[in-house]
């Protein structure tokens, strides 16, 4: 599997996915995630809401670290993404929860790719 190498993005595959179809730019995907600061403090988790996040990869709907770090995933795959500030929110604080210039750590799971069956 090809994993993009981008300065400021560390990708650790924690569980392999199924099938051969990998995510690419323009795919509409459903992703479950948990986000924590480097201190370990959780700031968000789709698991808590019981609904994965839906977005289109590579369209700037999410932080750049996600647009790049979720490329090449297969359905069911789990990745840990460690994202430097310049690929996250940079020098902006977010909602009083994420301080400016924060490195973010996400545990992600690709739940689905629109139009692709599990195992394809």
Swiss-Prot record:
Any one GO biological process: chaperone-mediated protein folding
GO MF annotation list: peptidyl-prolyl cis-trans isomerase activity
Function as written in the Swiss-Prot or TrEMBL entry: PPIases accelerate the folding of proteins. It catalyzes the cis-trans isomerization of proline imidic peptide bonds in oligopeptides.
Tagged with keyword Isomerase: yes
Keywords: Cytoplasm, Isomerase, Rotamase
Family assignment from sequence similarity: Belongs to the FKBP-type PPIase family. FKBP1 subfamily.
Note: Binds to the immunosuppressant drug FK506.
Enzyme Commission numbers on file: 5.2.1.8
Catalytically driven reaction(s): [protein]-peptidylproline (omega=180) = [protein]-peptidylproline (omega=0)
Compartment(s): Cytoplasm
Broadest EC class assigned to this enzyme: isomerase
Organism: Neurospora crassa (strain ATCC 24698 / 74-OR23-1A / CBS 708.71 / DSM 1257 / FGSC 987)
Protein name (record): FK506-binding protein 1A
GO cellular component: cytoplasm
Source organism superkingdom: Eukaryota
Residue stretches making up the PPIase FKBP-type domain: 26-114
Pfam families linked: FKBP_C (PF00254)
């Amino acid at each position: 599997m090809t994993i993009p190498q981008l300065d400021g993005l560390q990708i650790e595959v924690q569980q392999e996915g199924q099938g051969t179809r990998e995510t690419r730019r323009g795919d509409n995907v459903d992703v479950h995630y948990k986000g924590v600061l480097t201190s370990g403090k959780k700031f968000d988790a789709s698991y808590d809401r019981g609904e994965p996040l839906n977005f289109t990869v590579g369209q700037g709907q999410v932080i750049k670290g996600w647009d790049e770090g979720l490329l090449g995933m297969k359905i069911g795959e789990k990745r840990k993404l460690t994202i430097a500030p310049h690929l996250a929110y940079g020098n902006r604080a977010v909602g009083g929860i994420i301080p400016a210039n924060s490195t973010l750590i996400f545990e992600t799971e690709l739940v689905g790719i629109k139009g692709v069956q599990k195992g394809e």
